[in-house]
């Protein structure tokens, strides 16, 4: 909402006003659709429309796009009024989304951990939502108590972030590395983060999952090419 320190809608709308692109995309948390934000949501959409854009809004789930994480996000797409083609959101029904264990098996076993297979069997669901950093969520860890309990069910210690994968004789509940967190967020395995651990985890946790962004971007491009 208007009072949230993380609200970047005013800046994003300012950029649209100054640059007047053919299309723009915005994303926000699922709570943006809550009834208590109806007035603010309409204010944002009307502000975009007043700049000469048609607006589209939809809730997309990252796990429908192959991301092994529960991450629903509201995606707003604005198409300039002179573009006549109609924008369509991607379907995103991906039945091949891996579990956390399947996605992280190679990274978690990088140091020959003897307990790997048992862990993979336990981590047989998608991950809870990865959090970034703010005054409410510091780092590096995997979120508040309720989130850590969800991670614990997957055999993951959410109280911190490890520097490397478990050793061969490791006994206990492993922590994720920043590379593992990035993979769960949908980043390619070759992607590197030059920052220190806390800053890197904050960037990763605040990111919009790349596979979802790509899918929406492809549909925006299709709309612009067909106009």
Functional labels for PLM-detected ranges:
Residues 1-152:
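Class I S-adenosyl-L-methionine
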Residues 108-227:
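C-terminal target-recognition/interaction regions appended to catalytic cores
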């Amino acid at each position: 909402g208007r009072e949230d320190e993380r609200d970047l809608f005013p800046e994003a709308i300012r950029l649209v006003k100054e640059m007047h692109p053919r299309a723009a995309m915005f994303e926000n948390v699922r709570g943006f659709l809550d009834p208590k934000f109806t007035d603010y949501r309409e204010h944002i959409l009307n502000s975009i429309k007043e700049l000469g854009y048609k607006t589209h809004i939809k809730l997309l789930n990252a796990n429908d796009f192959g991301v092994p994480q529960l991450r629903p996000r509201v995606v707003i797409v604005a198409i300039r009024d002179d573009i006549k083609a109609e924008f369509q959101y991607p379907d995103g029904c991906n039945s091949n989304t891996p579990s956390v264990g399947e996605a992280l098996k190679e990274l978690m076993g990088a140091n020959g951990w003897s307990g790997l297979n048992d862990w993979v069997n336990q981590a047989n669901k998608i991950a809870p939502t990865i959090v970034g950093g703010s005054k409410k969520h510091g780092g590096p860890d995997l979120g508040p108590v309720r989130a850590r309990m969800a991670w614990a069910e997957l055999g993951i210690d959410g109280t911190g972030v490890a520097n490397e994968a478990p050793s061969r004789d490791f006994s206990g509940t492993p922590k994720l590395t920043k590379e593992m967190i990035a993979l769960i967020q949908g980043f390619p395995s070759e992607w590197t983060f030059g920052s220190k651990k806390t800053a890197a985890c904050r960037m990763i946790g605040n990111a919009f999952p790349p596979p979802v962004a790509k899918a929406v971007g492809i549909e925006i491009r299709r709309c612009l090419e067909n106009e």
